[in-house]
Design a protein with these regions (language model features):
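N-terminal leader/capping segments at the start of a protein or of a new domain
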Residues: 1-66
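Structural signal for conserved beta-strand scaffold positions within catalytic alpha/beta enzyme cores
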Residues: 38, 70-73, 150
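Conserved short histidine dyad/triad with adjacent acidic residue
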Residues: 71-95
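Short, conserved beta-strand element in jelly-roll/cupin
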Residues: 92-113
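A short secondary-structure junction signal
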Residues: 111-114, 119-121, 140-141, 160-162
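Conserved metal-binding segment of the jelly-roll/cupin
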Residues: 122-142
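Double-stranded beta-helix
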Residues: 139-176
């Protein structure tokens, strides 16, 4: 189940609120320019190729208006899962929107907005658009299973700018 847990940066052990209804999650995040929605699933065969996954959601991708898309797959048997997890746990910003659609699995995107942290557990059929410049990090868990579409403004993609803030170490991760 998708949820958002809202924390004060002063109390990383206890969320101020936890929301599980999609409408509540949407409105809470929309107050900060973050877009969250659920897409209708498209039929995909087990073992679908990247091209098949992109084709299955082509209408939705086109409607968003981004120029490039890639499929990101990380599972528990990925040879670099530990390195990838550690890398994504560093707080970062991007000069363009961070756009992810979950085809399968789950992950925890955590946004640092002012004096609050919004931990959003995304799962299959969730779309998340984090506006450019919003500090955030991502936890795929110790035994990851996530397949996402990542959308970009340009074919070159986007390079993160690490903030150097170690705030992510203070807040619960996906497995906590």
């Amino acid at each position: 189940m998708s949820y958002v847990a809202v924390y004060s940066i002063a109390t990383p052990d206890t969320p101020n609120k936890v929301l599980t209804h999609a409408d509540d999650i949407q409105s809470t995040l929309a107050d900060h320019g973050v877009r969250f929605e659920r897409w209708q699933p498209s039929p995909l065969e087990k073992g679908a190729t990247d091209a098949q996954m992109i084709a299955a959601y082509q209408a939705q991708i086109k409607a968003l208006g981004y120029a490039a898309v890639e499929v990101v797959r990380v599972t528990q048997d990925h040879p670099q899962k530990d390195e990838l997890r550690a890398q994504f746990l560093d707080e970062r910003t991007y000069s363009e929107d961070e756009v992810r659609f979950f085809i399968a699995g789950q992950g925890l995107f955590t946004l640092h907005i002012g004096d609050y942290v919004y931990s959003l557990r995304c799962e299959k059929n969730d779309l998340l658009i984090i506006p450019a410049g919003v500090p955030h990090w991502f936890d795929m868990g110790e035994n990851p299973h996530c397949v996402t579409l990542r959308l970009f403004n340009t074919a070159q993609g986007s390079v993160p700018s690490l903030t150097g803030n170690e705030i992510a170490t203070r807040f619960p991760g996906l497995d906590d």
